[in-house]
């Protein structure tokens, strides 16, 4: 009896971790100096020191909350009946499978350090992934009444309003984070003179406290339905007006972020919201729904025509055509530099003897004649097609006061530099950082579409083949940067991504599939399918009679927004904790509604 009374009593303190996740976590912005440890790789800078303002302390704060939630979750489960615990474990069986596979992936990780402590620009190591699962389970366990949902809704609105206030100001050209008084809050005084925050995005582009404009798109698509729910269902008029202003600020932030994924996801969510609203409020909703869909498409086309920020990028997704390139690939091997160029296969070799050097060039196995300039520093050869290609001899500084011979070739509008004097028996490519690395021609599932979606075609195309390699347990949490072919410099050039280090695949599903394995991706999707099944039954197939059903619908739409945006964005500590909270809250609301229907005798 005592335990039952404890469960019925609305404990506001139990909601505090969830309130902090939706209200405070996205706002945390504090300076942290990171040593990436990536300088051991030739494709990264020798200097491994970077500044982080948006990720590290968000992760620390979240992990502290996760520990608290785990303790409280164990306590809550201890008060439940055997039937309730059985229902809990069955509901979260896919989550347990996903987390188990994440643990196994960490055990087999290509780098334990990153999988346990986190990667620069990502910060989703194993402890954070476990925290996501704990968040969903905790939300499911402690949210039991409509009043508790309202207690969670208000901090969410406050958090959204703070995040979007910064965003709207950035949209108007005033970046609050660059102001001196804010700098003193987020950067320790001892290093303020030498280190300060400087935005890397153009003036007027919104990134707010979410690290990157892409995640503004995910944030808005996920929380816009929640803001709209607050407009209609908070009891106090002042709160409803405040929520309405916040919803407008969310849309302005989305517009300023120029996030194409966010635009598509938010539009999908809004159309689905209108569809569900019409179904509930209009008798012959099925006659109006097609018109709403047409209106949505018209708005999208209008946005593209008027060149709204980021909207023209959406059009590119549907109009993308395969591009052909003269330079197909470059491989540095022990037997020369292998080049596929305009349908021919070239092999370039350099012979060095003291201060003398010479070249041998093979085209499809046939040696070409070489001519040298009077100075001898430039060699030329003519292809069967009649095109002349020049090879220029240069000096490369191997060490202080130590120089060796290297050569550069202009191909398809770009100079490529090589040497066989840096690694015994091997040719190496000298990248834009001046570091000697192997140049590879990595498998690419989307060859010719590298520029699609702001060069996402490049990273997607080279990530897809990794799924077969890491099918079972993945490469390990936060190790994408280590297994992605960062040294396919020809593909980089085609994608206009020279020098860009990809720490994430810009796709939630590829991120999960590569890092923790395709099996874990299936478990991840199963986590949502469990929720989706109950939501479709609850929100599409019957009319709403209680506000909890409307709020549950908003939560459902929020999760849809996150997953749609995930087609072009990744999971990141700035937004993912809120998604997992919504997933747990949505499951809790479905449970509440099922209990109500059972009580009313409705099957």
PLM feature spans:
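Extracytoplasmic loops and strand-loop junctions of Gram-negative outer membrane beta-barrel proteins
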Residues: 119-122, 444-449, 546
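Interfacial loop-to-helix junctions that mark the boundaries of transmembrane helices
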Residues: 42-60, 84-90, 119-123
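Short, hydrophobic transmembrane alpha-helix segments
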Residues: 30-37, 45-55, 77-82, 235
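Extracellular loop and loop/strand-boundary signature of outer-membrane beta-barrel proteins
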Residues: 122-125, 138, 448, 497-498
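TM-adjacent membrane-interface loops and short helices in multi-pass inner/ER membrane proteins
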Residues: 212, 351, 415, 421-502, ...
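Alpha-helical transmembrane segments of multi-pass inner-membrane proteins
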Residues: 2-31, 58-75, 92-112, 125-401, ...
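Juxtamembrane membrane-water interface segments that cap and precede transmembrane helices
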Residues: 37-54, 112-115, 193-209, 458, ...
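Interfacial/capping segments of alpha-helical transmembrane domains
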Residues: 33-45, 175-188, 474, 484
């Amino acid at each position: 009896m005592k335990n039952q009374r404890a469960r019925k009593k609305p404990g506001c303190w139990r909601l505090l971790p969830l309130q902090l996740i939706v209200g405070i976590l996205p706002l945390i912005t504090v300076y942290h100096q990171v040593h990436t440890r990536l300088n051991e790789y030739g494709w990264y800078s020798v200097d491994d020191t970077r500044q982080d303002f948006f990720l590290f302390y968000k992760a620390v704060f979240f992990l502290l909350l996760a520990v608290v939630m785990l303790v409280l979750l164990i306590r809550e489960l201890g008060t439940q009946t055997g039937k309730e615990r059985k229902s809990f474990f069955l509901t979260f069986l896919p989550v347990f499978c996903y987390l188990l596979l994440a643990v196994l992936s960490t055990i087999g990780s290509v780098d334990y350090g990153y999988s346990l402590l986190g990667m620069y620009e990502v910060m989703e190591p194993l402890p954070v992934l476990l925290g996501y699962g704990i968040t969903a389970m905790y939300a499911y366990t402690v949210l039991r009444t409509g009043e508790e949902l309202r207690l969670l809704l208000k901090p969410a609105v406050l958090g959204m309003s703070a995040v979007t206030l910064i965003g709207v100001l950035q949209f108007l050209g005033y970046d609050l984070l660059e102001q001196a008084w804010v700098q003193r809050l987020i950067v320790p005084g001892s290093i303020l003179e030498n280190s300060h925050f400087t935005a890397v995005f153009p003036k007027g582009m919104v990134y707010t406290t979410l690290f990157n404009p892409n995640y503004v798109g995910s944030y808005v698509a996920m929380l816009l339905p929640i803001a709209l729910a607050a407009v209609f269902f908070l009891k106090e008029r002042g709160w409803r007006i405040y929520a309405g202003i916040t919803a407008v600020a969310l849309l302005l932030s989305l517009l300023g972020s120029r996030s194409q994924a966010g635009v598509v996801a938010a539009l999908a969510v809004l159309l689905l919201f209108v569809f569900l609203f019409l179904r509930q409020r209009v008798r012959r909703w099925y006659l109006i729904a097609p018109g709403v869909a047409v209106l949505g498409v018209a708005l999208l086309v209008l946005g593209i025509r008027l060149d709204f920020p980021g909207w023209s990028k959406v059009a590119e997704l549907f109009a993308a055509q395969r591009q052909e390139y003269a330079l197909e690939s470059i491989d540095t091997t022990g037997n020369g530099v292998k080049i596929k160029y305009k349908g021919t296969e070239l092999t370039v070799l350099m012979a060095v003897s003291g201060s003398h050097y010479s070249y041998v060039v093979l085209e499809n196995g046939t040696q070409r004649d070489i001519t040298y300039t009077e100075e001898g520093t430039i060699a030329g050869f003519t292809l069967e097609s009649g095109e002349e290609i020049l090879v220029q001899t240069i000096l490369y500084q191997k060490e202080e006061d130590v120089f060796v011979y290297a050569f550069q070739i202009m191909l398809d509008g770009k100079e490529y530099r090589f040497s066989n004097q840096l690694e015994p028996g091997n040719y190496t490519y000298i990248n834009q950082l001046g570091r000697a690395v192997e140049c590879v021609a990595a498998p690419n599932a989307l060859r010719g579409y590298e520029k699609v979606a702001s060069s996402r075609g490049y990273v997607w195309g080279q990530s897809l083949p990794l799924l077969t390699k890491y099918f079972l347990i993945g490469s390990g949490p936060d190790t994408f940067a280590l297994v992605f072919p960062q040294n396919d410099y020809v593909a980089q050039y085609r994608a206009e991504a020279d020098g860009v280090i990809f720490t994430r695949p810009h796709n939630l599903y590829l991120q999960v599939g590569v890092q923790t394995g395709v099996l874990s991706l299936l478990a991840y999707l199963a986590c949502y399918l469990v929720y989706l099944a109950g939501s479709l039954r609850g929100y599409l197939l019957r009319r709403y009679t209680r506000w909890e059903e409307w709020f549950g619908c908003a939560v459902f739409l929020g999760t849809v927004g996150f997953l749609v945006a995930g087609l072009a964005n990744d999971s990141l500590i700035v937004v993912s904790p809120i998604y997992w909270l919504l997933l747990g809250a949505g499951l809790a609301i479905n449970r509440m509604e099922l209990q109500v229907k059972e009580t009313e005798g409705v099957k």
